[in-house]
Amino acid sequence: MFYPAFLNLQDKKCLVIGAGTVAERKAISLLRSGSDVHLISPRVTERLHDLIQHNQISWFDRQFQDGDTSGFFLVCAATDSTQTNTRIFKEAHKKNGIDLVNVVDVVPECTFAATSIVVLEKVSISISTSGKSPAVCRRIREYIESKFCQDTINHLEKESLVYKDDKKTPVREEHTFKSKVPYPIGFLTADRQCTIIGKNNKLLERVNLLRKCGAKVKMADDDTLRRDPSAFLTFADVEYQEYNGSQLVELTRNPMQGTFYTPLITVDHDLVIGITPNLDSKSAWQYAKQIQTDLATQFESQGYGHFLDFLGSLRPKVMTSIPTPAKRKQFFEDIIDQNSKGEKELCCFDFGDLGCSNECTFNLVRTHRTDQIKKTIQKKIQTYSYN
């Protein structure tokens, strides 16, 4: 399970290395969160080219070079070379000490993972399956968009950007959270030390969540106000004397002043849905709480976590047996929509009916009847591996 958080990226220097749609998505998400976005790539997509032409993104028209990651707050590696991506991770995280590094599709070379997000008029909602099923994540995102359609502004990947006088300006300025949409992520905290400074109910909640995420939690005394160099994340309810905006710190007394904050959450095993208001006000947080309660009824203790565990258990076999990302993606789509008779139909995931009893993969898994589908899955893996 990844630790859910929203980053405060206003004016932070962020670097994306790579081309293609993945790099485009990374760059646009960071831009919409207020970042000072830099891109290194010998080629760019049409949409990125438009942003560069309007001075929204700083572009370096070349391949990655040693030393490129120096001075950045966050680095995303999205090249088509595994070796290059590994070089980027080692330089950024291990040599330069950058805490926020993401290598696309390589969890061991990530300190965080980006999550899907739905931006509503009053709140933003992040969805993470902790990397176990992008297909499930997408369907939940689409369901949430549909459920709150009268309030939906647009999904990050579809929304157009706003230009003003050819300068970097807030995108969708009506969504003011430091003038930007917050950047949703999941911290990979397993076996990483996280320091807690102070004692209150919020911090106790953070401790419990961190432990669920596999973090090593260190409790500090109230008067320990200086940075712990061994800490990946720091949570404090007191004034943090050495905080300069570069460390990963949540200040629970004033979340908007830290580098990140923990949203309201709905959790079922590795399914984590985060809800945060787009305005920092009492009424906005109350509305976010209402959304949290609604989504908890829909998603907590309904079998989604077990379903993700099942799909995640298939990934090692699928990764070694099915040769291309496109085929692997389609395999999981087919499995999700499979019923017990081997027929393909669109699975509702109980979104519209909590009492749904269709003999689909989802219902068979959550009622512990996986033996009925394992043979079908094995045959499908063989089919995809040969085609």
Labelled PLM ranges:
Residues 74-80, 85-113, 234-261:
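ADP-ribose/adenylate-binding Rossmann-like module
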Residues 61-66, 222-225, 238:
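Conserved SAM/SAH-binding loop
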Residues 47-57:
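Short, conserved SAM-binding/catalytic segment
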Residues 1-43, 50, 163-221:
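Hydrophobic, well-ordered beta-alpha structural blocks that scaffold small-molecule cofactor pockets
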Residues 41, 59-63, 105, 221, ...:
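Short loop/edge segments at beta-strand edges and connector loops
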Residues 36-38, 73-81, 123-131, 270-282:
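Short beta-strand and adjoining strand-loop segment in the mid-core
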Residues 55, 70-74, 227-233:
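Short acidic/histidine-rich motifs immediately flanking catalytic phosphotransfer sites
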